[in-house]
């Protein structure tokens, strides 16, 4: 038998600026503990202000 497969406990997410500037952060979050989407107030360097960033899933391109 092979080695057991490890479960993924963290997920990479994309935090997109609510100011619609196109700026985003990539970060990780626990897949097991957090079920709600994140809302964080972070700095958007495009407009030089702190704005809300909303969580989105990262789309993966299939080859």
Curated annotation (Swiss-Prot):
Assigned keywords, A-Z: Mitochondrion, Ribonucleoprotein, Ribosomal protein
GO biological process, one term: translation
A Pfam family per the record: Ribosomal_L33
One Gene Ontology cellular component annotation held by this UniProt entry: mitochondrion
GO molecular function: structural constituent of ribosome
Major subcellular site: mitochondrion
Domain of life (superkingdom): Eukaryota
Family: Belongs to the bacterial ribosomal protein bL33 family.
Entry protein name: Large ribosomal subunit protein bL33m
Gene: mrpl33
